[in-house]
């Protein structure tokens, strides 16, 4: 009998449930999970994605020797010190969400100083927003998930929340929300820029080698086509790719 082919070694990553980008309930572990999986397959490995609360995911992904890193993260100067970032594996477009019957008007982030804003602990929303929040210029209240913030917004416990645009649409498309609730939510899209996201490989010699191998493999994979096909198959209203 011919010998059975050996199973490829798994490359493990830590993340949190963040549909439609990462979820154990979605095909390929979500859109970004699918993109990463395609590159890792090209490298000759299988992909294993484990789910934790976000702060725990960062701790495990960056420091547990059984993991290659954390997926997926926006680059900023602070994070550059803790990991080796891959080339882009997608993008995120943060928006300010509020209720139509209580609109929030702001020409720039600094104009939100009187608005109580829901965020998620451990997330980066861009250097400007993060700096304003750290300085106390913005009144932010961290929660443990975007889902909780959406519920708080609808319950009027927040005047506004910051959230990824396509994730908001995905969450509101769930059956637990009525069409009337979906229609109550409006977004301001101009306050944040679209940002690329990356695999955050551990800041070790092995992590650097993995990051370089990942980037080489990514150049041989048509990630844009995979993303287009994924959104088409998902058929989530308004969830077309956002160009970086």
Per-region residue spans from a language model:
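Short beta-strand-to-loop elements that line the ligand-binding cleft
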Residues: 46-53, 137-152, 189
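Extended ligand-binding regions for polar small-molecule ligands
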Residues: 33-42, 110, 115-116, 196-231
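Bilobed "Venus flytrap"/periplasmic-binding protein-like clamshell domains
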Residues: 26-38, 100-135, 149-151, 166
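Ligand-binding clefts/hinges and TM-proximal coupling segments of bilobed small-molecule sensing domains
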Residues: 46, 124-138, 180-181, 215-244
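Periplasmic-binding protein-like
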Residues: 15-17, 91-95, 179-215, 238-243
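Extracytoplasmic small-molecule ligand-binding "clamshell" domains
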Residues: 6-81, 119, 143, 233-234
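Acidic, polar ligand-binding/catalytic clefts
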Residues: 37, 50-111, 125, 186-192
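Short helices/loops that flank or line small-molecule/ion binding pockets
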Residues: 55-67, 84, 111, 147-169, ...
């Amino acid at each position: 009998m011919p010998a059975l082919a050996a199973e490829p070694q798994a490359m493990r990553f830590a993340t949190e449930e963040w549909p439609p980008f990462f979820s154990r309930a979605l095909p390929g572990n979500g859109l970004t999970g699918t993109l990463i999986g395609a590159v890792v397959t090209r490298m000759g490995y299988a992909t294993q994605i484990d789910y934790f609360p976000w702060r725990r995911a960062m701790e495990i992904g960056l420091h547990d020797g059984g993991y290659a890193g954390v997926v997926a993260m926006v680059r900023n100067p602070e994070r550059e010190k803790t990991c080796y970032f891959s080339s882009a594996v997608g993008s995120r477009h943060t928006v300010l969400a509020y209720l139509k019957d209580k609109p929030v008007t702001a020409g720039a982030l600094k104009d939100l100083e009187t608005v109580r804003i829901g965020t998620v602990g451990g997330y980066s929303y861009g250097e400007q927003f993060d700096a304003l929040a750290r300085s106390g210029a913005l009144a932010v209240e961290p929660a443990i998930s975007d889902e909780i913030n959406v519920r708080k917004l609808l319950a009027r416990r927040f005047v506004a929340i910051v959230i990824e645009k396509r994730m908001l649409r995905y969450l509101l498309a769930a059956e637990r929300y009525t069409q009337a609730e979906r229609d109550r939510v409006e977004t301001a899209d101009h306050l944040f820029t679209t940002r690329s996201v990356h695999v955050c490989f551990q800041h070790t010699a092995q992590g650097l080698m993995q990051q370089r191998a990942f980037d080489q493999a990514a150049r041989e994979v048509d990630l844009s086509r995979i993303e287009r096909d994924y959104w088409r198959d998902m058929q989530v209203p308004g969830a077309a790719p956002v160009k970086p």
